């Protein structure tokens, strides 16, 4: 089975590692992969999709989020992080499979409609989220979270083993080891997590150096900073994904680079929660570290729109550095090809053999005008938002077509919102 995406006004993507913009492009998709650009497959009986008045680009990867936390959108929004977390954690003790499923579905609808084709998620009841992922057909990296302050680590390990076994051969679900943080997970559990990562060959995904309080707490307890602590325990490797890093020291950057660990920047959430600090994007890039971008959860962002997040990442870096060293192509790479690298997939590009996760934007959208080859990338990063998305394919399957799905998904989102309000209303003042 395949598609011919025919006569796109523009195709913008990474081809052989270089950013290319191709006018009047035709892209062939076969068996879930990119088969080529401009290569005829019309005789194979593939379905042609007329892409006139559209821009073809790779799907966006949300490299860190908490999908079911649409449950908490607008919940104690203006509280600082410690108070906000205490309110959230109080409600999370009452969660169940059904409410996590409903909240996951609401978020996944939002992601699909705004051009996200894959995401990494850290939350409770990952089975509920996985079921919704498979229903809608996008990709996700998932796994039960280790968080000793709330859950028995032995129980989490059993859940992880079952989850990893169930989805070991899935094309869309990638099991991961989720770890909340070094301040909620004890030393013995972290050592066990390292053993599990080696045994199961699964990546570890963890919040690290997010706040000043976290850094001071770990330094006070162990006489080292969080990244140093993880390194001392043997967790620092190419299988480690570090989220936030707003309060990381210069020498810890060298540890990250040497280990080949991946990092994820979540700018909007960090600003909204007033965690301050600074994500050292330029220094990490100069060291060759792979950087992804994530929205964080819809409770702390409050949007899951990766177009907005790309723009915010550039703006925050420029505000911090007082220059324009971080450019549109840096964050476009982070949200596409780097995101897929973090997932362990060859994607985010139009090379032959890349996974066929692509998005079509409406090139007549006023946000994109005036439109030329020289300003196309700038317009995508700085001007548009997810409302420009007209069509989404994941794994070579058409999972969203605005003309077909838009109103039905909006109505479904409203119904899910009402279901969520029935649950969360019990915890409101």
Where are these regions (language model features)?
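Divalent metal-binding segments
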Residues: 52, 79-125, 181-189
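Acidic, glycine-enriched loop/beta-strand segments at the rims
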Residues: 12-24, 273-275, 340-377
